[in-house]
Amino acid sequence: MTHILTLDNAVATLTQGGVIAYPTEAVWGLGCDPRQEAAVLRLLEIKRRPVDKGVIVVTSRVDVLRDWVDIDALAPARRQDVLASWPGPHTWILPVTARAPRWVTGEHDGLAVRISAHPVVAALCAAWGAPLVSTSANLAGEPPARSRAALEPALLATIDGVVDGEVGALAQPTRIRDARSGQILRD
């Protein structure tokens, strides 16, 4: 049976290194505390995703990532584009500092970041007060789940709980753009 988490339960689960599922703008996501290497490695093992690919993090405020990203390294117009798009369904690859953990960035010199306007994600991030991994709740190479009912039972059996809610109206996962160049990396 799937354990449904309140926001307070979700925060406690994340603090303890747990992995949770939650609805996002287009699909169900898996999340954990990106500051805890063991939690991220567990999430990646659940998904069967290589660590070198990196993960997206969501947050309620960009300043909680100040130790990991250097938004001021962007050209002023690019920085304005990024900040003006948030909160919203926009994921940007931001330049990282030397303190950004490789288990989050993978082999990349940037970190994928989104400040979501989705009500569940926004409330979860605000309650959590820290960055949160956001990767689709599916095994690598499989289609992402667009409803809680579509979450694989085998995947649900490996995680610590679910924050209930509905996915947003996007038909596809969020677009990913490089904040330095503006180039679209995933559409």
From Swiss-Prot:
<dbReference type="InterPro" id="IPR006070">
    <property type="entry name" value="Sua5-like_dom"/>
</dbReference>
<dbReference type="GO" id="GO:0000049">
    <property type="term" value="F:tRNA binding"/>
</dbReference>
<comment type="similarity">
    <text>Belongs to the SUA5 family. TsaC subfamily.</text>
</comment>
<dbReference type="GO" id="GO:0005524">
    <property type="term" value="F:ATP binding"/>
</dbReference>
<dbReference type="InterPro" id="IPR017945">
    <property type="entry name" value="DHBP_synth_RibB-like_a/b_dom"/>
</dbReference>
<dbReference type="GO" id="GO:0006450">
    <property type="term" value="P:regulation of translational fidelity"/>
</dbReference>
<keyword id="KW-0547">Nucleotide-binding</keyword>
<dbReference type="InterPro" id="IPR023535">
    <property type="entry name" value="TC-AMP_synthase"/>
</dbReference>
<keyword id="KW-0548">Nucleotidyltransferase</keyword>
<feature type="domain" description="YrdC-like">
    <location>
        <begin position="4"/>
        <end position="187"/>
    </location>
</feature>
<dbReference type="GO" id="GO:0002949">
    <property type="term" value="P:tRNA threonylcarbamoyladenosine modification"/>
</dbReference>
<comment type="function">
    <text>Required for the formation of a threonylcarbamoyl group on adenosine at position 37 (t(6)A37) in tRNAs that read codons beginning with adenine. Catalyzes the conversion of L-threonine, HCO(3)(-)/CO(2) and ATP to give threonylcarbamoyl-AMP (TC-AMP) as the acyladenylate intermediate, with the release of diphosphate.</text>
</comment>
<dbReference type="Pfam" id="PF01300">
    <property type="entry name" value="Sua5_yciO_yrdC"/>
</dbReference>
<dbReference type="GO" id="GO:0061710">
    <property type="term" value="F:L-threonylcarbamoyladenylate synthase"/>
</dbReference>
<keyword id="KW-0067">ATP-binding</keyword>
<dbReference type="InterPro" id="IPR050156">
    <property type="entry name" value="TC-AMP_synthase_SUA5"/>
</dbReference>
<keyword id="KW-0808">Transferase</keyword>
<keyword id="KW-0819">tRNA processing</keyword>
<protein>
    <recommendedName>
        <fullName>Threonylcarbamoyl-AMP synthase</fullName>
        <ecNumber>2.7.7.87</ecNumber>
    </recommendedName>
</protein>
<dbReference type="GO" id="GO:0005737">
    <property type="term" value="C:cytoplasm"/>
</dbReference>
<dbReference type="GO" id="GO:0003725">
    <property type="term" value="F:double-stranded RNA binding"/>
</dbReference>
<keyword id="KW-0963">Cytoplasm</keyword>
